């Protein structure tokens, strides 16, 4: 009897001891981090999120729950331990030994343009016998992902894009200085054969052309107007506008041009309209793509005329101006018509999702290129 009582007392002391030990030490030297595989991806592109748990102590963790939430537009393929409502909620269970590091990779698809962050993780641990639970909150640093708008690719728009590209290249050709050499680049179908660099072509085995500097450095400007005065918001057209702007940006930058970008949609971080002055190369490409991803379209948009009318009219360093707007209300149309009278190098892309094209006044038909979304490309 005394021996049995001793066993019971020992078991009780063991239980209480481990419980006190876990309560005090379970989170010590325990690090949890989340990391996206990529800094930025395109809409519809696959990527992964890694959960990294490291237990740098002798005390094992029999059960550790890692809980976090993020935007529901990141479509995770592994649905076990998750639920999706207004947001995506994840609850993963780990068993971590002493001095052990565990990494779990979660595949997902970037379902929609945006800037996504995970700021904190909730941890729930248990004691050795799973009879008690302990909670803590961990701040996650530098866990963010850009999902860039995919370039608009409707066949009708591609035709308009080629036509615009020809117009801009013809205008740029007039600004080239034939006596100032800038470098060599890959041959493109629109290049003149007289610009071919045959020595570089023979050396590399790929067609190369000479690049010239310009008598004056002028830029292409892209303005995006997301202001919507209608009762029903055209969400599909708003997103299509940003995709059209992306296609324009990539096309001009690939030609080695300087590109400026302006949008009255507020940045989700600083709540200011997007203003990126003229620049070129990969740095400008990355900056504009990130700005496009961060544009918040959920609220009321600032007036385009109030924000950008002065910027629009100052066009002394502008080679061409592109406007993207799904709406053609009177004040905005009048502003562009006034500009077009002085500066004819202007193209307005107007996306629409209706079956029939919107009615345009005669004075606007020369200015506007209609971009249909149609059923196969209507909504995101």
Cite the ranges covered by each PLM segment.
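Feature marks short, highly hydrophobic, charge-poor N-terminal signal-anchor/signal peptide-like helices
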Residues: 1-10
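An amphipathic, basic-hydrophobic helix/alpha-beta surface used to engage anionic
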Residues: 14-271
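Exposed, interaction-prone extracellular/peripheral surfaces
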Residues: 189, 193-380
């Amino acid at each position: 009897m005394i021996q049995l009582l001793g066993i019971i007392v020992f078991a009780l002391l063991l239980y209480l001891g481990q419980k006190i030990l876990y309560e005090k030490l379970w989170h010590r030297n325990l690090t949890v981090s989340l990391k996206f595989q990529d800094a930025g991806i395109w809409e519809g592109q696959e990527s992964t999120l890694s959960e990294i748990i490291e237990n740098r102590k002798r005390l094992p963790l029999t059960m550790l729950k890692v809980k976090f939430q993020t935007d529901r537009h990141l479509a995770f393929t592994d649905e076990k331990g998750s639920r999706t409502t207004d947001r995506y909620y994840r609850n993963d269970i780990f068993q971590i030994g002493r001095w052990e590091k565990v990494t779990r990779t979660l595949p997902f698809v970037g379902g929609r343009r945006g800037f996504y962050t995970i700021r904190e993780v909730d941890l729930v641990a248990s004691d050795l016998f799973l009879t008690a639970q302990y909670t803590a909150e961990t701040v996650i640093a530098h866990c963010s992902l850009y999902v860039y708008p995919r370039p608009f690719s409707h066949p009708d728009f591609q035709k308009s894009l080629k036509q615009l590209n020809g117009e801009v290249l013809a205008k740029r050709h007039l600004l080239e200085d034939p006596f100032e050499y800038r470098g060599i680049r890959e041959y493109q179908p629109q290049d003149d054969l007289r610009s071919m660099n045959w020595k570089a072509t023979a050396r590399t085995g790929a067609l190369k052309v000479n690049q010239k500097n310009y008598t004056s450095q002028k830029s292409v400007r892209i303005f995006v107007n997301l202001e919507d005065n209608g009762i029903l918001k055209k969400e599909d057209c708003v997103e299509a506008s940003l995709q059209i702007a992306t296609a324009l940006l990539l096309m001009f930058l690939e030609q080695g041009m300087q590109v400026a970008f302006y949008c009255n949609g507020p940045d989700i971080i600083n709540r200011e309209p997007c203003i990126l002055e003229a620049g070129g190369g990969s740095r400008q490409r990355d900056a504009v793509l990130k700005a496009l991803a961060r544009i918040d379209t959920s609220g009321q948009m600032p007036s385009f005329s109030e924000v950008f009318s002065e910027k629009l009219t100052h066009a002394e360093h502008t080679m061409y101006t592109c406007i993207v707007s799904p709406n053609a209300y009177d004040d905005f149309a009048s502003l562009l018509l006034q500009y077009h009278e002085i500066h004819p190098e202007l193209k307005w892309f107007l996306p629409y999702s209706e079956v029939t094209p919107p009615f345009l006044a005669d004075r606007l038909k020369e200015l506007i290129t209609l971009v249909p979304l149609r059923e196969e490309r209507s909504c995101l």
